[in-house]
Regions:
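Vicinal oxygen chelate
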Residues: 2, 31-34, 63, 67-82, ...
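Core segments of cupin and vicinal oxygen chelate
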Residues: 8-66
């Protein structure tokens, strides 16, 4: 089933923030917190410190009305910089690959900052774009089993 969620970026305190939100909304995580150490190492990427390996790669928390907020920690070693405009992303999870492509093509029109749709290690087709109005969109299509 298609869904829309809000994706939040943090600089090292995603777990602290989400522990707080979990208490505020009296809810539980949708699955375990995924850590940076759980990501397959990129031989061309930076070597993560032990502290960075423990940071949040991905977490999901249902809040009001079933809306899900998600988060990650941005890594300075990967030259990520948290600033207004990249701290919040609208995550789209369409039902089909075709709909994912259609939405990506439409929202990336006129954009200069996109990561094209690609197959990822977690089994999804994923991409991002900052649209011409300055809104960041993330696309995640996972085929049904």
């Amino acid at each position: 089933m298609a869904r829309v969620s809000t994706y939040l970026n943090f600089m090292g305190n995603a777990e602290e923030a989400f522990d707080y939100y979990r208490t505020v909304f009296a809810t539980e995580y949708l699955g375990p917190i995924q850590r940076m150490k759980d990501v397959p190492a990129d031989p061309n990427g930076p070597t993560l410190s032990e502290a960075e390996k423990e940071l949040v790669m991905h977490v999901e928390l249902p809040i009001l009305g079933g809306h899900v907020i998600m988060a990650t920690d941005m890594l300075e070693s990967m030259h990520h910089e948290l600033k207004i405009g990249n701290n919040t992303t609208i995550n789209l999870e369409p039902d089909t690959r075709e709909e994912t492509q259609r939405l990506f093509d439409a929202l990336s029109e006129g954009s200069t900052d996109c990561a094209p749709l690609m197959d990822m290690f977690w089994g999804a087709t994923w991409g991002t774009c900052l649209d011409r109005f300055g809104v960041r969109w993330m696309f995640n299509y996972t085929p049904s089993p």
